[in-house]
């Protein structure tokens, strides 16, 4: 008898759940939507239950290094810039409308949060850092980070120069070193800039922020000089662990609420390796502080110690800082060269501009290259802007509705009506699609044309959001632009021609983890393969 009652109770609860979720809630949503003057959005058709086929296609696109274009193709199929999709039993929205992006990031900032699934996934590795928290915890983390990205620290380009010189040594001593052509001009061996640039930015970021560099470029140079032939990272190195952590987190983000099914063991191994390095940096900083030998202008670790509840939180904040200071810069710089090898006209014009502004290459640039001069070099800034327009470091982002709210446009037959967003709905937005809309950017929106930045269009602010916007705008924005600009100047000073060796004229290739970097039809992890000709001034 008792068993029968339990079964009956379970059946009744199941019926109540079904009626509530598939009848009452949709009806309440419809009535509230109409009351607010909102219109419906079309939903992407699905073939498999719970839209599992979308996840399958997304993972396939990632494997084929075409995730941003895969998403753009879905927008084209839907025929509008705001639409819905049902995924794993939940209704989500996706948009590439400037007004909706503005609402998500700024004007309706308090209506949206990171969302539980995304926050919990990132928290596994980044804990209580700025990327994995909302509300007061986010505000506190951002205020802790703000001083490290001050103009004074961003302007410390002399620290970067040492690492640039090491990278140039690697380029010019790879394999048999420089070789000469029929015109007696010196060329480098084939080299992947997408491999070298993340090492450069990690080495400089760890030195600037922690006072202790990872020196991954110096280690690579030593291996090269020893003719070991082994260009792989040490499996336990900080640099390798950081790369693998990002790759795993990227895949887990595409699995959404099922993120916990993938990569747990390897992710934890990576986190342990990263924590070991951070602990050694903390100990070294403590020792330098006690002996009075610390070279840090702003002791970020000491600030963390006073603001964080324990050593574990210090580690988490450091990893968040390195994610902000390393990945944005590395991805941007790699994409710049990805574009330049495909556009020799732009490379020549940029080089002529750089030589006029900063002079020819010298191993000791002194004060010729400064924060102010980089900002004032107009064509250099246009090249950076155009690169970020075509190849956003983060081509997709998302927010979750913290309460019942609306988006300004996208509903109704022509998409001009507001859209009702029930509490808990995830809203995805694609900067990749937004930045390539021909109705906003012209018929040449898919082409690399830095000159388009000579004139600003009305309303451009929310048509162009490579670093997001509003209160959560990327805190490392100026750091990334300054460091990328510096590296670009030094490279075009040194090399007058760059020859791409993995160019595919048919399509772009994207290596998408948590951030998006160039991919390659030859080798995903060795993109922007090129030869460089040493300049003779």
Swiss-Prot record:
The taxonomic lineage of its organism, from the top, reads: Eukaryota, Fungi, Dikarya, Ascomycota, Pezizomycotina
Give the top-level enzyme category: oxidoreductase
InterPro entries from the UniProt entry? Cyt_P450 (IPR001128), Cyt_P450_CS (IPR017972), Cyt_P450_E_CYP52_fungi (IPR047146), Cyt_P450_E_grp-I (IPR002401), Cyt_P450_sf (IPR036396)
Its biological purpose is as follows:
Cytochrome P450 monooxygenase; part of the gene cluster that mediates the biosynthesis of alternapyrone derivatives. Alternapyrone is a decaketide with octa-methylation from methionine on every C2 unit except the third unit. All the domains in the polyketide synthase alt5 are apparently involved in alternapyrone synthesis, that is, the 8 CMeT, 7 KR, 7 DH, and 4 ER reactions in the 9 KS-mediated condensation steps required for alternapyrone synthesis.
Keywords recorded for this protein, A-Z: Heme, Iron, Membrane, Metal-binding, Monooxygenase, Oxidoreductase, Transmembrane, Transmembrane helix
What name is this protein filed under? Cytochrome P450 monooxygenase alt2
Q: Which gene encodes it?
A: alt2
- Any GO MF annotation of the entry: monooxygenase activity
Where is it mostly found?
membrane
Organism, as annotated = Alternaria solani
Membrane topology according to the record: Single-pass membrane protein
Q: What is its EC number?
A: 1.-.-.-
Entry similarity comment? Belongs to the cytochrome P450 family.
Question: SUPFAM superfamilies of this UniProt entry?
Answer: Cytochrome P450
The subcellular localization recorded is: Membrane
- Cofactor(s) the record lists: heme
């Amino acid at each position: 008898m008792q068993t029968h009652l339990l079964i009956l109770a379970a059946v009744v609860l199941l019926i109540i759940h079904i009626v509530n979720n598939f009848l009452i809630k949709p009806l309440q949503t419809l009535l509230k939507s109409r009351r607010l003057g909102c219109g419906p959005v079309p939903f992407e058709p699905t073939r498999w239950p719970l839209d599992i086929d979308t996840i399958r296609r997304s993972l396939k696109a990632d494997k084929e290094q075409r995730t941003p274009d895969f998403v753009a193709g879905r927008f084209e199929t839907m025929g509008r810039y705001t639409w819905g999709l049902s995924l794993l039993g939940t209704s989500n929205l996706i948009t590439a409308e400037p007004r909706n992006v503005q609402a998500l990031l700024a004007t309706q900032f308090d209506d949206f949060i990171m969302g539980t699934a995304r926050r919990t996934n990132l928290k596994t590795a980044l804990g209580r850092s700025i990327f994995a928290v909302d509300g007061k915890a986010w505000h506190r983390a951002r205020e802790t980070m703000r001083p490290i990205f001050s103009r004074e620290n961003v302007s410390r380009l002399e620290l970067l120069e040492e690492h640039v010189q090491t990278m140039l040594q690697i380029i010019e001593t790879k394999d048999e070193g420089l070789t000469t052509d029929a015109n007696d001009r010196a060329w480098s061996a084939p080299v992947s800039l997408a491999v070298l640039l993340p090492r450069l930015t990690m080495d400089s970021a760890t030195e600037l922020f922690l006072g202790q560099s990872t020196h991954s470029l110096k280690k690579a140079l030593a291996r090269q000089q020893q003719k070991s032939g082994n260009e792989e990272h040490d499996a336990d190195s900080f640099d390798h662990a950081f790369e693998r952590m990002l790759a795993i987190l990227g895949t887990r983000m595409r699995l959404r609420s099922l993120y916990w099914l993938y990569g747990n063991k390897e992710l934890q191994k990576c986190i342990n390796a990263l924590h070991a390095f951070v602990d050694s940096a903390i100990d070294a900083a403590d020792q330098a502080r006690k002996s009075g030998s610390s070279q840090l202008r702003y002791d970020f670790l000491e600030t963390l110690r006073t603001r964080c509840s324990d050593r574990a939180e210090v580690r988490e904040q450091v990893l968040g800082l390195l994610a902000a200071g390393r990945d944005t810069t590395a991805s941007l710089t790699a994409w710049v060269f990805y574009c330049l090898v495909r556009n020799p006209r732009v490379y020549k014009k940029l080089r002529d501009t750089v030589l006029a502004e900063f002079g020819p290459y010298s191993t000791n640039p002194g004060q010729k290259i400064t924060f102010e001069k980089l900002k004032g070099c107009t064509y250099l800034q246009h090249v950076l802007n155009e690169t970020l327009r075509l190849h956003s470091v983060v081509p997709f982002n998302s927010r979750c509705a913290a309460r019942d709210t609306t988006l300004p446009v996208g509903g109704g037959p022509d998409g001009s009506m507001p859209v009702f967003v029930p509490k808990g709905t995830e809203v995805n937005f694609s900067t990749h699609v937004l930045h390539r809309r021909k109705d906003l950017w012209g018929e040449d929106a898919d082409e690399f044309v830095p000159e388009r930045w000579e004139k600003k269009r009305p309303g451009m602010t929310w048509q162009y959001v490579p670093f997001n916007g509003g209160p959560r705008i990327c805190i490392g924005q100026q750091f990334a632009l300054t460091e990328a600009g510096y590296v670009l100047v030094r490279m075009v000073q040194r090399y007058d021609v760059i020859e791409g060796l993995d160019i595919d004229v048919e399509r772009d290739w994207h290596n998408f983890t948590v951030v998006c970097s160039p991919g390659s039809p030859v080798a995903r992890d060795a993109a922007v393969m090129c030869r460089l000709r040493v300049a003779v001034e």
